[in-house]
Amino acid sequence: MPVKSPFESSIAKPGQGKVVLSLLAPANPSLSTLTYKYPLKLLTRTPNFVPQSASPSASQPVHLYLLSYGGGLLPGDQIDVSITLEPRTRLVVTTPQGSTKIFKTEASPGRTLSDQSRQTLEVRIGQEAALCYLPDPSVPFKDSRYEQIQTFIVDNTAKGSSRSSLCVLDWVTQGRTSRGENWDFHLWKGKNEIWLLDDPISNTSSYSGDNEEKEKKKLLLRDSLILDDETSTSTPQARNNPPKSLIRERTSPHGVIGTLILYGPVFENLSSFFVDKFTSLPRIGARNWSSSAPAAVEVPQNYDSQVTFTAARVRAGCVLVKFGAANLETAKDWLGGTLREEGSIAREFGEEALSCL
């Protein structure tokens, strides 16, 4: 009779990764699980940073780096990452390669969905746990095809300051501007979902997702972005006479577009900061022309005037920020400047969390 190994079996599929962040008494974060397989690579470190959080139970954040060999994804690459934050843990997720490159998909008559690169991320966040996910932007090369799905499951049984918290940045550029690329890829699809877990199973498996079919969840937010040229390059005629880019028309005049999602008590001040910044912007028709009051002095241009953005509160205090800028440098300066001006991320997670900005 074969003896069953007490150790977890290795990941079978290429590109899969699993991370479980636990907390050892009294408040020492520890990665109880960290596995990955080519072409995915996961690196971690504990920074020399002591959080100055208002929460006395806040633990020291752990940094996780998501990398891929070659700095990008080839056609057919499938990345699947599962992350679990057990109660009171804090995790910073970044991509230290400068950008996530999406390499070209070669045109072929028999092209299928498997020819495009794909990335899936699922994160489970326990009570009083916090995720700060600030990756570098995606850079889709000309003729590339890419899809990503990011799912965040938060514990909805906790109330007040014990709720889960998350900050998620998702942004994409027009391509390699140094080579003249300007939204010349075929497809970029991104979907972000936040689910509220109403009835988690009262054991460790509830955080690892082993009993997902028994869980009671409800959708808090679903945000999708589809950039599709709506053309087929599988025929010689289409390749020789490429149509005008629909993606370029729809994103003009922006060279970068992105989404920032904020939820939970750790990012409550940051959420209010973005909403207040947006509501303070001048509006067309806001001036009372019947008044004899002198016109306001025109303020000098700043990064708020160089970036188009909106900020709105949705259900359960979640804030959704959408932004667009002419180029990556402007977007970085605006977003990085705003996050540093408010100060929550640097205070709770350290300045290293803002490395992509």
Residue ranges and their predicted role:
Residues P14-K18, P61, Q78-D80, R118-T120, ...:
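Broad gene-expression machinery/nucleic-acid interaction feature
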Residues A107, S117-L196:
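Internal, conserved structured core segments that host functional sites
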Residues V20, Y65, S82-T84, E122-R124, ...:
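Residue-level recognition of well-ordered beta-strand positions that form the cores
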Residues D170-E351, C356-L357:
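A structural signal for small-residue-enriched, beta-sheet-centric alpha/beta enzyme cores
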Residues L42-T44, F103-A107, D143-R145, S178-E181, ...:
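A short, polar/proline- and glycine-enriched secondary-structure boundary/capping micro-motif
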Residues P2-S138, K142:
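N-terminal, charged/glycine-rich beta-strand/loop interface patches
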Residues A27, K159-S162, P200-T204:
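Short, solvent-exposed loop/turn segments that connect beta-strands within catalytic domains
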